[in-house]
Amino acid sequence: MVYVYLNHDGILGRGEAAPSGRYNEFTNDILNILDGGIDLQETIGDPLEFSEHVFPQCGGIKALEVAFSMAILDWWCQKERISVYEYLGAEPLKAPKTSYTISIGDMDLIPEKVKEGSPFHILKVKLGMGIDQDKAIMNAIREETDQTIRVDANEGWDLTSGIEMCNWLAERNVEFVEQPFKSTNLADTATLRKESPLPLIADENSLNSADIPKIEGVFDGINIKLMKCGSLFEGLKMVKMARERDMQIMLGCMIESSVGITAAAHLSPLVDYADLDGNLLINNDPYRGVTVENGKLVLPRGNGFGVSLSSNESNLM
């Protein structure tokens, strides 16, 4: 994780970059760009104009672009004495419940993993390891809990297994299936959508707003991740485009600290589902912001993102 700070006129705006090698983005590349210097406008004004000035200097790294979009929005909203959710036109009380991801590396650890997720109403389970293994994982989880489950197939199925699994999962309190096939296999995804009793949510097929027209009628919904799409402005555009097409919307994340997760949470009242647990899956989160109460996201009140430093690390602000 790399933190970006915009410190001007006594106001500090924070942003976070959490790059993913899956999209050929790496921390060292971000640090090299930052070490080379970023040219800023002489006068800091409109957040969108600021971002459009900075983004071309980010080397095409979306995680760095979103970090700058966070920092300017946090700074500008503090300056204007409003929250970011107000800027986005979101109502904090409409923030959804978030799922909690349980990663299954060892079947014997399933009871422990399920217990970790017991404070949440919804679990997210990653499958796509073969029908027999996937069913064994689900059966083991169902022996421990009847919580609603969201399944991420991680591009791991083919059409035959996808049809079988979607029908099988529909009988086991599963809410939807995320990314059943490779992102290049839209034809089989369209076929599965006709056969599946469960909604299909795009992940790798919904990187940014340009992808949405391509998957209309193929998926039932999209997963927006700020680190993939490149800014809160782009995330908001994706929300609007999906709504125009009657598509469901999930807001997801990478492994991020409370800076990135809180930024996404300010957008969450505008979506249907949230999977914003990245800060809960790390042990050294140096910030505090959005919290979870009874499984529901609770946005911090105050100006900007409402994020504050919770550690004594001297190199952080």
Predicted regions, residues:
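Metal- or metallocofactor-binding catalytic centers and their adjacent structured scaffolds
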Residues: L6-N7, L12-K79
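Hydrophobic faces of well-ordered beta-strands that scaffold small-molecule active sites
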Residues: G13-G15, P96-I102, H121-V125, I149-A153, ...
